Swiss-Prot record:
NCBIfam families: lpxK (TIGR00682)
Residues involved in ATP binding: T60, V61, G62, G63, T64, G65, K66, T67
Family to which this protein belongs: Belongs to the LpxK family.
Signal peptide start and end residues: none
Enzyme Commission designation: 2.7.1.130
Annotated organism of origin: Azotobacter vinelandii (strain DJ / ATCC BAA-1303)
A Pfam family that the UniProt record links to this protein: LpxK
Name under which the protein is recorded: Tetraacyldisaccharide 4'-kinase
Amino acid sequence: MALADRLLEAWYRGHPALVLLRPLEALFRCVAQRRRERFLRGEGGIYRAPVPVVVVGNVTVGGTGKTPLILWLIEACRRRGLRVGVVSRGYGARPPRLPWRVTADQSAGQAGDEPLLIVQRTGVPLAIDPDRPRAVRALLKEQPLDLILSDDGLQHYRLARDLELVLLDAVRGLGNGHCLPAGPLREPAERLASVDAVLHNGAAWDPPGGYAFSLLPSALVHMATGERRPLDHFPPGTALHALAGIGNPRRFFATLEALHWRPIPHAFADHARYRAEQLRFSPALPLVMTEKDAVKCRAFAPADCWYLAVDAVPSPAFADWFDAALARLLASS
């Protein structure tokens, strides 16, 4: 097990040795608090875009289902006739220059796996740059837009925002409640009180002060042909290899089990870069992976290789809240 995986295990399941990291946690909390206070005072060269900005992010380390929810938000905005752009840090991407406009024909190595997935699914204008204000300016210079979605960036305070949406895993929650490196929190837990909405991935119903959303499988997609098959393409009890290089691979494996298949799990690091030989498993069985992994593996995927398409389904209460929030933003912009 890699060090990152060991830390995640300790943060979310507990480990007595983490107490040794408390002094570093105190330093981290101090720095995080000072950065936020500077933002609240309007210091540090904050950029306010001429259109509303909605930040979708995390206060925890580890996967929360952010990309599927962003896809849902894009479509929700489009249903209102809005022209939407997306900015992202582009973690792991190696573009020739920054900011970089992502297109559907680029490689994941050039564009980043999550940005490429978003563009391939939606065709939305998307720019990657660790300097998010610069990415926003590049998109707005290129074409007129009504709204910007920031993929992650909750802690990137140089970009002013009009709405903050935070995602939590309903099972993992806030882990041990401590900040990095003694726990999984990027900011103290009280930060949740200042955001506009908290969405709980996997919650059965809307928790107090938050909203539920689920990731529902919709189809199996063949990697080579793009053919979509219904979920009963593999009958119950089918053994298969399952590959996931995401923030929370266990959730993906549990989803396959809930579909009554028998996955042999192969977990990789989040944003892993794959080679063809890493996809050759024994015994010879179908291989099913996440869509995020598929954008990196399509060129060398084995013959019987599929990805599981999933869709974010927020609670009706959140859908109504977001629609009303958009109306307020547009009326005041």
